[in-house]
Amino acid sequence: GYIPLIQTLGGKPVFIDTSASAFKITPELIKQHISDQTKAILLNYPTNPTGVTLSKSEVEVIAKTLSDYEIFIINDEIYAENTFNGQHTSFAEFDFIRDQLLLISGLSKSHSATGIRIGFLMGPEYLIEKLTFMHAYNCICANVPSQIACIAALNEGLDAPQYMNRAYIERRNYLVSKLKKLGFELDAQPEGAFYIFPSIRNYTSDDFDFCVKVLEEAHVAMVPGSSFTDMGKGYIRISYAYDMDVLKEGMRRLERFLKANYNI
Protein backbone atom coordinates (compact mmCIF):
# COMPACT_ATOMS: atom_id res chain seq x y z
CA GLY A 1 0.00 0.00 0.00
CA TYR A 2 2.96 2.36 0.28
CA ILE A 3 3.63 2.70 -3.45
CA PRO A 4 0.30 4.33 -4.44
CA LEU A 5 0.46 6.65 -1.42
CA ILE A 6 3.93 7.84 -2.41
CA GLN A 7 2.84 8.34 -6.02
CA THR A 8 -0.35 10.15 -4.99
CA LEU A 9 1.75 12.65 -3.06
CA GLY A 10 3.97 13.27 -6.08
CA GLY A 11 6.88 11.14 -4.95
CA LYS A 12 8.81 8.57 -6.94
CA PRO A 13 9.44 5.21 -5.25
CA VAL A 14 12.93 3.81 -5.82
CA PHE A 15 13.30 0.11 -5.11
CA ILE A 16 16.36 -1.68 -3.74
CA ASP A 17 16.98 -5.25 -4.85
CA THR A 18 18.09 -7.22 -1.78
CA SER A 19 17.88 -10.71 -3.29
CA ALA A 20 21.68 -11.01 -3.50
CA SER A 21 22.10 -10.24 0.23
CA ALA A 22 19.56 -12.77 1.57
CA PHE A 23 16.83 -10.13 1.31
CA LYS A 24 18.58 -7.86 3.83
CA ILE A 25 19.29 -4.19 3.27
CA THR A 26 22.97 -3.27 3.62
CA PRO A 27 24.86 0.02 4.03
CA GLU A 28 26.37 -0.49 0.57
CA LEU A 29 22.95 -0.83 -1.05
CA ILE A 30 21.70 2.25 0.76
CA LYS A 31 24.64 4.35 -0.42
CA GLN A 32 24.13 3.17 -4.00
CA HIS A 33 20.51 4.32 -4.08
CA ILE A 34 20.41 7.56 -2.06
CA SER A 35 20.67 10.76 -4.10
CA ASP A 36 20.14 14.47 -3.51
CA GLN A 37 16.49 13.86 -4.46
CA THR A 38 15.91 11.29 -1.70
CA LYS A 39 13.46 12.43 0.95
CA ALA A 40 13.00 9.26 2.99
CA ILE A 41 13.81 5.57 3.19
CA LEU A 42 11.09 3.06 4.05
CA LEU A 43 12.13 -0.12 5.84
CA ASN A 44 10.12 -3.11 7.09
CA TYR A 45 11.60 -5.66 9.52
CA PRO A 46 10.64 -8.43 10.07
CA THR A 47 9.75 -8.30 6.42
CA ASN A 48 6.70 -9.04 4.35
CA PRO A 49 6.99 -11.04 2.06
CA THR A 50 10.26 -12.79 3.00
CA GLY A 51 10.04 -13.18 6.78
CA VAL A 52 13.64 -11.97 7.03
CA THR A 53 14.68 -9.79 9.96
CA LEU A 54 17.80 -7.95 11.13
CA SER A 55 20.14 -8.56 14.05
CA LYS A 56 20.95 -5.81 16.53
CA SER A 57 24.38 -5.24 14.96
CA GLU A 58 22.85 -5.01 11.48
CA VAL A 59 20.25 -2.48 12.64
CA GLU A 60 22.92 -0.37 14.34
CA VAL A 61 25.14 -0.29 11.25
CA ILE A 62 22.20 0.74 9.06
CA ALA A 63 21.15 3.40 11.58
CA LYS A 64 24.68 4.84 11.59
CA THR A 65 24.73 4.87 7.80
CA LEU A 66 21.39 6.68 7.59
CA SER A 67 22.43 9.25 10.20
CA ASP A 68 24.85 10.65 7.62
CA TYR A 69 21.95 11.72 5.38
CA GLU A 70 19.33 14.42 5.88
CA ILE A 71 16.40 12.14 5.12
CA PHE A 72 13.55 10.64 7.09
CA ILE A 73 13.68 7.00 8.17
CA ILE A 74 10.24 5.40 8.07
CA ASN A 75 10.38 2.00 9.71
CA ASP A 76 7.38 -0.32 9.62
CA GLU A 77 7.78 -2.59 12.66
CA ILE A 78 4.30 -4.11 12.53
CA TYR A 79 5.82 -7.62 12.81
CA ALA A 80 8.22 -6.71 15.68
CA GLU A 81 6.57 -9.03 18.21
CA ASN A 82 6.64 -11.85 15.65
CA THR A 83 10.43 -12.24 15.85
CA PHE A 84 11.38 -15.88 16.37
CA ASN A 85 15.05 -15.98 17.37
CA GLY A 86 16.04 -13.47 20.01
CA GLN A 87 14.65 -10.01 20.70
CA HIS A 88 13.55 -7.59 18.00
CA THR A 89 15.81 -4.55 17.76
CA SER A 90 13.94 -1.34 17.02
CA PHE A 91 15.52 1.56 15.19
CA ALA A 92 14.11 3.68 18.03
CA GLU A 93 16.80 2.27 20.33
CA PHE A 94 19.41 4.54 18.73
CA ASP A 95 19.22 8.12 19.96
CA PHE A 96 21.30 9.54 17.13
CA ILE A 97 18.54 8.97 14.52
CA ARG A 98 15.47 9.83 16.60
CA ASP A 99 15.00 13.22 14.93
CA GLN A 100 14.84 11.42 11.58
CA LEU A 101 12.75 8.43 12.60
CA LEU A 102 9.08 7.65 12.13
CA LEU A 103 8.17 4.26 13.56
CA ILE A 104 4.98 2.45 12.55
CA SER A 105 3.41 -0.39 14.51
CA GLY A 106 0.06 -1.78 15.62
CA LEU A 107 -1.86 -4.81 16.86
CA SER A 108 -2.88 -6.39 13.55
CA LYS A 109 -0.02 -8.90 13.48
CA SER A 110 1.11 -9.21 17.11
CA HIS A 111 -2.41 -10.05 18.31
CA SER A 112 -4.06 -11.24 15.08
CA ALA A 113 -6.31 -8.21 15.39
CA THR A 114 -6.54 -7.23 11.74
CA GLY A 115 -10.19 -6.25 12.07
CA ILE A 116 -9.84 -3.56 14.72
CA ARG A 117 -7.43 -1.45 12.60
CA ILE A 118 -5.46 0.11 15.46
CA GLY A 119 -2.02 1.42 14.65
CA PHE A 120 0.68 3.47 16.34
CA LEU A 121 3.04 6.15 15.06
CA MET A 122 6.07 7.39 16.95
CA GLY A 123 8.38 10.19 15.91
CA PRO A 124 9.87 13.57 16.83
CA GLU A 125 7.39 16.03 18.31
CA TYR A 126 7.65 18.53 15.47
CA LEU A 127 6.58 15.86 12.97
CA ILE A 128 3.89 14.25 15.11
CA GLU A 129 2.17 17.63 15.53
CA LYS A 130 1.89 18.04 11.76
CA LEU A 131 0.88 14.41 11.19
CA THR A 132 -1.80 14.64 13.89
CA PHE A 133 -3.30 17.58 12.03
CA MET A 134 -3.38 15.57 8.79
CA HIS A 135 -4.75 12.49 10.56
CA ALA A 136 -7.64 14.43 12.08
CA TYR A 137 -8.97 15.34 8.64
CA ASN A 138 -8.49 11.87 7.17
CA CYS A 139 -10.11 9.53 9.68
CA ILE A 140 -10.86 11.71 12.75
CA CYS A 141 -10.21 8.92 15.27
CA ALA A 142 -10.24 5.18 15.88
CA ASN A 143 -13.71 3.85 16.66
CA VAL A 144 -14.51 3.19 20.32
CA PRO A 145 -14.99 -0.63 20.14
CA SER A 146 -11.55 -0.94 18.51
CA GLN A 147 -9.99 1.22 21.19
CA ILE A 148 -11.54 -0.95 23.92
CA ALA A 149 -10.20 -4.09 22.22
CA CYS A 150 -6.77 -2.47 21.95
CA ILE A 151 -6.74 -1.60 25.66
CA ALA A 152 -7.64 -5.19 26.55
CA ALA A 153 -4.86 -6.55 24.33
CA LEU A 154 -2.25 -4.25 25.83
CA ASN A 155 -3.36 -4.75 29.43
CA GLU A 156 -4.13 -8.46 29.40
CA GLY A 157 -2.54 -9.96 26.30
CA LEU A 158 1.06 -8.79 26.18
CA ASP A 159 2.24 -12.40 26.30
CA ALA A 160 0.00 -13.48 23.41
CA PRO A 161 2.69 -13.10 20.71
CA GLN A 162 4.96 -15.57 22.54
CA TYR A 163 2.37 -18.33 22.27
CA MET A 164 1.59 -17.43 18.67
CA ASN A 165 5.27 -17.48 17.74
CA ARG A 166 5.66 -21.04 19.02
CA ALA A 167 2.97 -22.13 16.59
CA TYR A 168 4.49 -20.05 13.78
CA ILE A 169 7.92 -21.63 14.30
CA GLU A 170 6.43 -25.12 14.12
CA ARG A 171 4.56 -24.27 10.93
CA ARG A 172 7.58 -22.55 9.39
CA ASN A 173 9.79 -25.56 10.08
CA TYR A 174 7.24 -27.85 8.48
CA LEU A 175 6.99 -25.69 5.36
CA VAL A 176 10.76 -25.28 5.01
CA SER A 177 11.23 -29.05 5.12
CA LYS A 178 8.29 -29.84 2.84
CA LEU A 179 9.03 -27.19 0.22
CA LYS A 180 12.67 -28.27 -0.06
CA LYS A 181 11.55 -31.87 -0.61
CA LEU A 182 9.27 -30.62 -3.38
CA GLY A 183 12.16 -28.90 -5.15
CA PHE A 184 11.68 -25.29 -4.07
CA GLU A 185 14.73 -23.25 -3.07
CA LEU A 186 14.96 -20.86 -0.13
CA ASP A 187 17.38 -17.96 -0.47
CA ALA A 188 16.80 -16.92 3.16
CA GLN A 189 15.41 -18.53 6.29
CA PRO A 190 12.34 -16.66 7.60
CA GLU A 191 12.99 -15.52 11.18
CA GLY A 192 9.89 -13.41 11.73
CA ALA A 193 6.40 -12.47 10.53
CA PHE A 194 4.54 -15.53 9.15
CA TYR A 195 5.60 -15.77 5.53
CA ILE A 196 7.95 -17.91 3.51
CA PHE A 197 9.31 -16.75 0.14
CA PRO A 198 10.59 -19.72 -1.88
CA SER A 199 12.01 -19.55 -5.39
CA ILE A 200 10.24 -21.49 -8.14
CA ARG A 201 13.27 -21.38 -10.47
CA ASN A 202 13.38 -25.18 -10.65
CA TYR A 203 9.93 -25.17 -12.25
CA THR A 204 9.36 -21.90 -14.07
CA SER A 205 10.26 -18.22 -14.07
CA ASP A 206 6.65 -17.04 -14.41
CA ASP A 207 5.49 -16.71 -10.82
CA PHE A 208 2.17 -15.09 -11.73
CA ASP A 209 1.15 -17.85 -14.11
CA PHE A 210 2.33 -20.47 -11.62
CA CYS A 211 0.17 -19.05 -8.81
CA VAL A 212 -2.87 -18.77 -11.08
CA LYS A 213 -2.54 -22.40 -12.18
CA VAL A 214 -2.07 -23.64 -8.61
CA LEU A 215 -5.15 -21.68 -7.56
CA GLU A 216 -7.31 -22.93 -10.42
CA GLU A 217 -6.15 -26.55 -10.43
CA ALA A 218 -5.17 -27.26 -6.82
CA HIS A 219 -7.29 -24.59 -5.08
CA VAL A 220 -4.31 -23.35 -3.10
CA ALA A 221 -3.80 -19.59 -2.81
CA MET A 222 -0.28 -18.16 -2.95
CA VAL A 223 0.95 -14.69 -3.88
CA PRO A 224 3.29 -14.20 -6.86
CA GLY A 225 6.51 -12.50 -5.88
CA SER A 226 6.18 -10.05 -8.77
CA SER A 227 3.20 -8.46 -7.00
CA PHE A 228 5.80 -7.05 -4.59
CA THR A 229 7.63 -5.29 -7.48
CA ASP A 230 9.51 -6.84 -10.39
CA MET A 231 12.36 -7.80 -8.07
CA GLY A 232 10.16 -10.56 -6.69
CA LYS A 233 9.82 -12.33 -10.03
CA GLY A 234 10.46 -16.03 -9.78
CA TYR A 235 9.35 -16.25 -6.15
CA ILE A 236 6.07 -16.97 -4.39
CA ARG A 237 4.84 -15.95 -0.96
CA ILE A 238 3.14 -18.51 1.25
CA SER A 239 1.51 -17.49 4.52
CA TYR A 240 1.55 -19.88 7.45
CA ALA A 241 -0.99 -17.97 9.53
CA TYR A 242 -3.19 -21.06 9.31
CA ASP A 243 -3.74 -24.21 11.34
CA MET A 244 -1.22 -26.96 10.69
CA ASP A 245 -3.94 -29.21 9.24
CA VAL A 246 -4.71 -26.56 6.61
CA LEU A 247 -1.03 -26.19 5.71
CA LYS A 248 -0.55 -29.93 5.37
CA GLU A 249 -3.58 -30.22 3.11
CA GLY A 250 -2.28 -27.31 1.04
CA MET A 251 1.09 -29.02 0.63
CA ARG A 252 -0.60 -32.29 -0.40
CA ARG A 253 -2.51 -30.42 -3.08
CA LEU A 254 0.61 -28.58 -4.22
CA GLU A 255 2.50 -31.86 -4.48
CA ARG A 256 -0.24 -33.39 -6.63
CA PHE A 257 -0.17 -30.29 -8.85
CA LEU A 258 3.60 -30.53 -9.32
CA LYS A 259 3.43 -34.22 -10.15
CA ALA A 260 0.72 -33.59 -12.73
CA ASN A 261 2.38 -30.59 -14.37
CA TYR A 262 6.14 -31.03 -13.86
CA ASN A 263 6.56 -34.79 -13.41
CA ILE A 264 8.36 -34.56 -10.08
Locate each region found by the language model:
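PLP-dependent class I/II
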Residues: G1-I264
